[in-house]
Amino acid sequence: VVAVVGFLFSALPMIYLHLASIGRLSPVSHTISDYIFLTHGGELLALSAVSLAVGSAALLRVILAVGVPRGGPVQVLFSVWCLGLLLAAVFPTDPLGSETSLPGAVHRYAGLAMFVSLPLAGFLLSVRFRESLAWSGAAIVVRRLSMVSAAVSVLFLLSHVPIVFSNGKGDEVLSGFLVQGLAERLLFGSIFALLGALLLGARTALRRVEEVVPCP
């Protein structure tokens, strides 16, 4: 329940900010983090990130309760994902075309850590799921979505190349080359799909475990 509520409260502010930014920010060239420059954008982005972190932590708790070892790489990677979300919420991004500040650098590397960690965690879980009867139905879906998320994550990182080589000279240098906003939205779509698959798989696995274990 906590995971579902967390994911819901993460998605709703994003939907609102996308609608509120129509005509002001480009979904192709501006990242989701740029919504901080909208009215109440910072608060809504923080709500979305914290809710996603809470939902992910609740999902991890269920996953650990049905067969995945505690303290292993999956738990570490999920923790990196959640910590990255919180850091990205606390440290805002820099305006497009400006020089990188310390908070902006923290935001960027927090994003790098979280976008690498979750697809890798999903892939490791899919390997683990193939060995478990309770999770067997989710293994293939989680594996494929993890690979898609990893591929789109690489695309998102590559989309920042024009920004790196712009040397802070302004938006006009980058005109026609910025697609990191589109890449990030595709990435978040694949990540939400991965988290949804894990959530459904966890629900099924928990039910199977309860059916096997007799009531006292």
Locate predicted features:
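Interfacial segments of alpha-helical transmembrane regions
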Residues: 1-5, 67-80, 136-150
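Alpha-helical transmembrane segments of multi-pass membrane proteins
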Residues: 7-26, 160
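Perimembrane loop-to-helix junctions flanking transmembrane segments
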Residues: 26-40, 176
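Interfacial helix-start motif at the membrane-water boundary
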Residues: 34-54
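Internal transmembrane alpha-helix with an interfacial aromatic "cap," most often the third helix
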Residues: 50-78, 119-133, 199, 205
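Hydrophobic alpha-helical transmembrane segments of integral membrane proteins
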Residues: 76-104, 156-166
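Membrane-proximal helix-loop-helix units in multi-pass membrane proteins
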Residues: 87-138
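Terminal transmembrane helical module of multi-pass membrane proteins
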Residues: 127-208, 215
